[in-house]
């Protein structure tokens, strides 16, 4: 575990990152074994503590329920409360150390953070698209919404083990995920499209790829062109996997409430750390690519452009959500919870995007 996290070994799974790891088969796949260690809460910080038995999770002061679980104070029903509960009750502490007294230490990044980002990157999700039905607008959009709901589950799990993220208050964690989910989804889509179709089609899932016909039939052709253009920019830049992973985290950390977060200082420190990680990733890129300074500028401009595209995608999402009955477009319960809570905040101008370059 120590060698993998510190980057001495970069393990890769020969399967689909879902190998069974138990007492007998623990040596079959080192990559899945390390992933399971991270999900179970192993971290380098705990090894340095003189009293490992007193290491506490974020939620240890929470009130137990009758079922033996734990709940967060003031949490309600639905996705946001369940997401908050999932973030707060998971044993995983995302490599954020706790002091002997149980208090959180300031968020930090362990050595070779890219090794950790590679290990926790979610697996590709299948849409379960019904190819026996015609590619009608409502069928395509409903399928995309169902896929987005599945992906959101992975986003929450990814955030739980993201180095530094668990050091933020639960309210801040939920807010950042809620404000960035569309950008994260479209950015990951662009990466898959870049790797699997060389930027020619939109690779939403292995069983749901948009060609030109599906783009036009989806009723969001211009938005599809925008997402494909991002993927083609990946092709032009020959974006590396390490750069993509660092940029993805920065998208999570780039939209905040206008009044700020509960712990704005911890958030800003975490964001600065990941900006440094992006610069390190650029420094590792092949020397045949653009000059380092110019490349960093190009990547941050691309991140800024993602916010503009994400805003347009949200507008379309909000429209189809409001007109879902008339358009016969279905939304999974998770997206209903997120969008219902997000619409008033976005449309009231309560969000603030952190751009790298002046608009």
From Swiss-Prot:
What ranges does the record give for the region Hinge, renumbered to this chain?
50-107
Region (Important for coactivator binding): which ranges?
157-160
Give the NR C4-type zinc finger regions: 13-37
Q: Which residues bind DNA?
A: 1-49
Swiss-Prot/TrEMBL GO biological process terms: negative regulation of DNA-binding transcription factor activity; positive regulation of gene expression; response to 11-deoxycorticosterone; response to cortisol
Annotated residues for binding of 21-hydroxyprogesterone: 145, 151, 192, 320
Give the SUPFAM superfamilies listed for this entry: Glucocorticoid receptor-like (DNA-binding domain) (SSF57716), Nuclear receptor ligand-binding domain (SSF48508)
PROSITE patterns according to UniProt: NR_LBD, NUCLEAR_REC_DBD_2
| Superkingdom, taxonomy of origin | Eukaryota
| Residues noted as binding aldosterone in the record, renumbered to the chain | 145, 151, 192, 320
Kindly give the CDD domains that the UniProt entry links to this protein: NR_LBD_MR
Task: Quote the record's binding site residues for Zn(2+).
Answer: 13, 19, 29, 32
Question: What InterPro entries does the database record attribute to this sequence?
Answer: NHR-like_dom_sf, Nucl_hrmn_rcpt_lig-bd, Nuclear_hormone_rcpt_NR3, Nuclear_hrmn_rcpt, Znf_hrmn_rcpt, Znf_NHR/GATA
Q: Provide one Gene Ontology cellular component.
A: cytosol
Q: Where in the cell is it found?
A: Cytoplasm; Nucleus
| Role, per record | Receptor for both mineralocorticoids (MC) such as cortisol. Binds to mineralocorticoid response elements (MRE) and transactivates target genes. The effect of MC is to increase ion and water transport and thus raise extracellular fluid volume and blood pressure and lower potassium levels.
For this chain, the family text in UniProt reads: Belongs to the nuclear hormone receptor family. NR3 subfamily.
Record's comment describing the protein's domains: Composed of three domains: a modulating N-terminal domain, a DNA-binding domain and a C-terminal ligand-binding domain.
User: Under which name does UniProt file this protein?
Assistant: Mineralocorticoid receptor
The protein's organism comes out as: Oncorhynchus mykiss
Instruction: Recall the taxonomic lineage recorded for the source organism.
Output: Eukaryota, Metazoa, Chordata, Craniata, Vertebrata
